[in-house]
């Protein structure tokens, strides 16, 4: 996160920024929050072939999150967001999804047991839409609750909408 007096205009360089790195991502933040509230959390995601993947795995384990189903994508970096926040509170964000987009619909078969054991499936839109849809439909078929936060904003087709029990919008 770069804190700046004002957001740079196209072609402008703002030289007054302060910078900090933090762990996160919508899915990661949801997993950590659920674990801190006492939930038994298994996090299914895809991380890249870089130091951030190892840092995140250690962080998740420290938070009590099961990491057995994290995919290691050796061909992509871990997903990253570049965030600028102006003193006014206005922000702009660029997401480089990297390994997030490696969580493909065909990989869901490997996670069927986790879905069987879950009480609720929590997802957001930083993974491929077809993966979200496949997981939601499978979870619904198994009688599981599905919570979906469509952020970043995305269109939700009728079939997916019918599989969602809780829709989080902001």
Language-model regions, residue ranges each:
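Glycine-rich phosphate/adenosyl-contacting loop at the front of the ribokinase-like
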Residues: 1-46, 51-65
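Residues at secondary-structure transition points
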Residues: 14, 18-29, 51, 73-77, ...
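Beta-strand->loop->alpha-helix junctions that form or flank phosphate-binding loops
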Residues: 18, 44-49, 67-78, 149-151
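Short aromatic/hydrophobic contact patches that present stacked aromatics
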Residues: 20, 44, 81, 120-121
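Ribokinase/PfkB-type carbohydrate-kinase core domain
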Residues: 57-72, 83-169
